[in-house]
Amino acid sequence: PENGRIKIDVIIPAFRPGDKLEQLLKRLQKQTWRPNRIIIMNTERQYWNAERYEPLFEGSETELTLIHLAQEDFDHGGTRHRGILESDAEICICMTQDAIPHNRELVKNLVSALMAGEDIAASYARQLPAADCGVIERFTRDFNYPGISRVKGKEDLEILGIKTYFCSNVCAAYKRDIYLKLGGFTAKTVFNEDMIYAATAVKAGYKIAYAANAEAIQDRK
């Protein structure tokens, strides 16, 4: 690992990737804390453009691991889980292919929030609205991803209720040892595998950190 730092892998499920994935891969390699490996779980080999993405890793300190899946084998929880099992890093960051780091500090700030306490199992980034998103989407992002960081645990259930378990599959970091101990993401989940895992972690006495200074832009267009 760089400078004796903790080893970090980034796991990205990809389906018919395009410009966003290229932008994401370029920005990940410019992070102040560079990932050791980027593991791409790609659905259907024919949609992967090797000439476009693989040269981005030539001469890079970050390695590419590419795993092709059949479409029927893809599901949100199970595919990410396979990626985490493929990793040997202490920390795994799961990102969607349309999540773009807002600046060069995303990985550093996300990992710092995760490492701030031994009992923190996961940390998730702040989602910034894309410049051209609508008013309702902007409001929802601001509501779910406020400007102040916080750590959530069992003691917050009375006040926050189900929001205690809020996490994000757009950009979140996990301590791999705790993840494996708790059994990881539920396979065959269509969505919310991150919140199901967060609920399991909180009930087991762990905490979830929201890192407001780790910023990603999700642009679905």
Tell what function each PLM region has.
Residues 155-174, 190, 196:
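A recurrent flexible, glycine/aromatic-enriched loop bordering the glycosyltransferase active site
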Residues 17-30:
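Short, well-formed alpha-helical segments that are part of the catalytic scaffolds
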Residues 125, 143-164:
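Short, flexible, basic/aromatic active-site loop/helix in glycosyltransferases
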Residues 70-87:
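Glycine-rich, basic loop-to-helix element that forms the pyrophosphate-binding segment
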